[in-house]
Design a protein with these regions (language model features):
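Walker B catalytic acidic pair
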Residues: 300, 306-307, 318
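Short beta-strand elements
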Residues: 18-24, 283, 387-390
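Short loop/turn elements that form and flank the Walker-type P-loop nucleotide-binding site
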Residues: 59-62, 99-100, 132, 150, ...
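Walker A/P-loop
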Residues: 219-260
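Basic, amphipathic alpha-helical bundle interface domains used for macromolecular binding and assembly
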Residues: 40-45, 58-60, 67-77, 289-290, ...
Length: 511
């Protein structure tokens, strides 16, 4: 007898339908799984047969062939356990599975028949809805995540026996309920705020400029100056995510297994802060069956790299593609996967190995060669992709002790939103440009024209401050953003002057 059950598997950030065929025939008792299964899928034979027996059902005693179609795509993970078990029970008890055609099933089975949580349930639910399925059966722990998808019934099941009894009409089971729009509207608040940060007004201004134009930023300062504290609050002033951005971000976190019962949907900008010992694969993504890395988990949010020179050179170099293209392509013999990775890079570093170069209160123990060598750990091509460099001095006592209320994130975000709206209108006809940071050479010439005074200012700065040639385009882009924050149609000398201040690393005077 042949039984057909439908499931789904994740490939990249999307899911595709998998048809599971279970066929029982006479002969020596053996279970064969075909259709490019990985080790976890092959091991499901032992898990499933034990779970079926412990749930009080029988499994076919003859030769059982399990086919996972389409056969040209490798299947990975234990999420096929539940549908395979249902197919085996249906074959054993000679139940017609044609009534199951409008259902889809995912879930890992424990040996006692309990259904365990799996990764990637959100894209699976979206695919099931696209395929016109009436219902999706998922582990109870994943039910709220899947219930964010409307127009399809989501059933969170506890064990194999409960699932089969419901399908036979023996017990009732209520679908999980979720209102994505309502959840999204009520979960866009942050636990931190810029009003928590005392002083550092010029650094806050630089961060505001960076956010307003979508620029990457590097902060340089001694230990304890507040670089990490400032960085953790940057997401709070980025314009709020749209519902489409939130769904795309949640799909990536679902695939990576970064969601849980309390956080079934990502409604705020992600903030990722990997340790400097992270591997290339951990940062970029990859593996035998590629999973998203930190650059993709930071998609639509902030990637914070603290102690930037301490990261491996190879790890920093692999970031050049996602910074340039906004996506990560991972190639394997079986094909290529693409993960989105449009994030704002926020990096922080000490000015020297001891951390106190240029400090007026503590003596630096590093020589000029050590400082230069420390700085050179960051490659030129990576610095090319960071538009703003800002020095973060130690906080003065008068700022720490001040009772003056600091500006909240909401006020800063309002200004950033207005600047972004101007840029959206400016680049409405540009497919790959949505903010000033992504302007091409053609767009720079079109939208960043300087008057004579501004040109003279840039010329003097590049000559007197020994700014590198690569800094020129960055100055123009940042000047355009500062003008947008002022609501100015044209770039003025004061906009250029401020932009020049944000090129610390291009000044040979720095060392």
């Amino acid at each position: 007898m042949l039984a057909k059950i439908y499931s789904a598997a994740v490939y990249g950030v999307d899911a595709y339908e998998v048809e599971i065929e279970v066929n029982a025939s006479g002969g020596h008792p053996v279970i064969v799984v075909v259709g490019l299964p990985d080790a976890a899928v092959k091991e499901s034979r032992d898990r499933v047969t034990t779970a079926v027996s412990n749930s009080g059902y029988f499994w076919p005693r003859g030769r059982t062939t399990i086919n996972l179609a389409p056969a040209d795509i490798k299947k990975e993970g234990p999420s096929f356990d539940l549908p395979i078990a249902l197919g085996m029970i249906a074959v054993s008890e000679e139940i017609d599975t044609s009534t199951f055609e409008k259902f889809s099933f995912v879930g890992e089975l424990a040996l006692d028949g309990a259904v365990r949580a799996v990764k990637g349930v959100l894209p699976v639910a979206l695919e099931a809805r696209r395929r016109g399925k009436h219902a999706l059966f998922v582990p109870e722990a994943n039910a709220q995540e899947a219930a964010m998808v409307d127009k399809i019934d989501i059933y969170g099941v506890q064990n194999l026996r409960q699932t089969f009894q419901f399908l036979r009409g023996e017990i009732p089971l209520l679908p999980a309920r979720g209102d994505l729009s309502a959840f999204f509207a009520t979960h866009q608040s942050y636990d931190v705020d810029f009003s928590d940060v005392k002083g550092q007004g010029h650094v806050k201004r630089a961060i505001e400029v960076a956010v307003a134009g979508g620029h990457n930023i590097l902060m340089i300062g001694p230990p304890g100056s507040g670089k990490s504290m400032l960085s953790k609050r940057i997401a709070t002033i980025i314009p709020p995510m749209s519902l489409e951005e939130a769904i795309e971000t949640t799909k990536i976190h679902s695939i990576a297994g970064a969601l849980d019962g309390e956080k079934s949907f990502v409604a705020t900008r992600p903030f990722r802060s990997p340790h400097h010992t992270i591997s290339d694969i951990g940062l970029l993504g990859g593996g035998a069956f590629p999973n998203p890395g930190e650059v993709s988990l930071a998609h639509n949010g902030v990637l914070f790299l603290d102690e930037l020179p301490e990261f491996k050179r190879s790890a920093l170099e692999v970031m050049r593609q996602p910074l340039e293209d906004g996506k990560v392509t991972i190639s394997r013999a079986a094909g290529s996967l693409t993960f989105p990775s449009e994030f704002m890079l926020v990096a922080a570093m000490n000015p020297c190995p001891c951390g106190y170069f240029g400090d007026l209160k503590r003596e630096c123990r590093c020589g000029p060669v050590q400082v230069q060598r420390y700085r050179q750990r960051i490659s030129g091509p990576l610095l090319d992709r960071i538009d703003l460099h800002i020095e973060v001095p130690a906080v003065e006592y008068r700022d720490v002790a001040s009772e003056r209320a600091e500006e909240p994130s909401s006020a800063i975000r309002e200004r950033a939103v207005r600047a972004r709206e101007l840029q959206q209108k400016r680049f409405a006809r540009e497919a790959k440009t949505n903010c000033n940071a992504r302007m091409t050479t053609r767009l720079l010439k079109q939208h960043c024209k300087l008057d004579q005074d501004s040109q003279d200012l840039v010329r003097v700065a590049m000559t007197e401050l020994n700014l590198s040639a690569r800094a020129y385009d960055r100055i123009l882009k940042v000047s355009r953003t500062i003008a947008d924050l002022d609501g100015a149609e044209n770039i003025a000398p004061e906009h250029v002057s401020e932009a020049i201040q944000y090129r610390t690393f291009d000044r040979t005077l720095w060392v």
